[in-house]
């Protein structure tokens, strides 16, 4: 039998049980996601995808909106099941009635099936209508006692590829404080206290990636001492970030203009961390001064 070409996950379940968190989790796992798609549109959408090979992992949130829901979704499941090129699963999210009521009260939203405004009545009706679909689901997750982070971890464990289950990447970047802090930085380190190559005429137009500048920055005693402290701080905390489920940790190193000191430090840090972790290194403002000079 040929290998399935597309992975399809239909995410459904009780309103308030965590479908929004779930679809965000699938997006983090590389799935193409659509939230709240009407069941009748699913077959047409899958037919559209057959004309392209760009999407191989798809997650769809299908909500209960009417009494005809089960008949509509059953029709979808029958069509998908007969498609030999689609490997599909149903993820059903559930939670205790008491917890669902508490979540609705916290968000001050009304239940979609609560015609008279009573949340519990809507929950009971929805549970009754969804019971057949829950019985068909390959994956049922009770989110009553789960935090959003724990739900993301559960979904990752059940639906990610083996290579993704332990995925964790470190982004190291240099920047210049004069151009603003990186908005996506988790950790920021300031190296403006170190000797500045800018004041050495022969180094001014070079960057921290050039050996003369790199050596000038890193060979000072205070640089050597600070770098070792920095490395000793960062290396032990990376396993903790990974354990907590963080997929990317962004470490930013800044100097005044982001051309010399921060570039040298960030590059050395990235090279050392790359011995044990997947690392990407970038230098946001390395050429900013040169571009400004050229425009003037």
Curated annotation (Swiss-Prot):
Q: Which residues bind GTP?
A: 63-66
The lineage's top-level taxon is Bacteria
Q: Does the keyword rRNA-binding apply?
A: no
* One Pfam family it belongs to: RapZ-like_N
Q: Which InterPro entries match?
A: P-loop_NTPase, RapZ-like, RapZ-like_N, RapZ_C
- Which Gene Ontology terms cover its molecular function? ATP binding; GTP binding
Residues where ATP binds: 13-20
Instruction: Cite the entry's keywords alphabetically.
Output: ATP-binding, GTP-binding, Nucleotide-binding
Report the PANTHER family cross-referenced here: RNASE ADAPTER PROTEIN RAPZ (PTHR30448:SF0)
Sum up the protein's function in the record's words. Answer: Displays ATPase and GTPase activities.
Identify its protein family.
Belongs to the RapZ-like family.
Could you identify this protein by its name?
Nucleotide-binding protein SGO_0954
